Amino acid sequence: MSDTSAPQKYRRILLKVSGEVLMGDTPYGIDTNTVQSVAEDVAEIVKSGVELCLVIGGGNIFRGMAGAAKGMERSSADYMGMLATVMNALAMQDALERIGVETRVQSAIPMATVCEPYIRRRAQRHLEKGRVVIFAAGTGNPFFTTDTAAALRAAEMQCDALFKGTSVDGVYTADPKKDPTAQRYDRLSYMDVLAKDLRVMDASAVALMRDSNIPIVVFSIKGRGNLLTVLRGEGTHTVVAEDRAA
């Protein structure tokens, strides 16, 4: 059992998880064991007293840009991708509530019989009451990624940081899965990321985080307990902030 009593650097964070992470070792869809592992990590954070909201991608089910590349009309493909994020959000809500974490899903596309609509002040009240809020359906608009949605919600919720949980333990000079000589950055500025096109998040998301002065912390969510470790400023990760000394 992880020690959740250590002091935390942040009061409120947004956790962005790619849909691909939820596949686990399966080629498609939702791996329930992986969802449960992420839910247990989130539960540890909530137990430590940090307020947490969550954005999950939909790439494990459908990716709008991939559909558009195969000839689909981009808006239709993006809406399908947004609906995929709702499926992932409901799976995560179920996993969290089964271990006793109060959770609300808010969708940018209204679907009243399934979840709450996105209402900023209501979401803030949920967080203040110790509930996890999962933001689904991206921004509700095509042509915007879930990275941009995560950045937008982090700014609206006045989060202290955006944690991006991926399958890689930080930001590298090249794809470490393809280039064994790739080196990991400990810290980067927002301008470094944009100028070097490092693909931490899409450019609009990075620019919004820069304008809101919200650090981006990139880490691997695949290791159990990594989220709490990185939250304490420990473990392997990359911080993107106003300057390298931030």
Curated annotation (Swiss-Prot):
GO terms for biological process: 'de novo' CTP biosynthetic process; UDP biosynthetic process. SUPFAM superfamilies: Carbamate kinase-like. GO terms for molecular function: ATP binding; UMP kinase activity. It catalyses: UMP + ATP = UDP + ADP. Its EC number is 2.7.4.22. Inhibited by UTP. Pfam families: AA_kinase (PF00696). It is found in: Cytoplasm. It comes from the Bacteria. CDD domains: AAK_UMPK-PyrH-Ec. ATP binds at residues 16-19, 59, 63, 166, 172, 175. Keywords: ATP-binding, Cytoplasm, Kinase, Nucleotide-binding, Pyrimidine biosynthesis, Transferase. UMP binds at residues 58, 78, 139-146. One of its GO terms (cellular component) is cytosol. Its main location: cytoplasm. Pathway: Pyrimidine metabolism; CTP biosynthesis via de novo pathway; UDP from UMP (UMPK route): step 1/1. InterPro entries: AceGlu_kinase-like_sf, Asp/Glu/Uridylate_kinase, Uridylate_kinase, Uridylate_kinase_bac. Belongs to the UMP kinase family. Catalyzes the reversible phosphorylation of UMP to UDP. This is Uridylate kinase. The gene is pyrH.
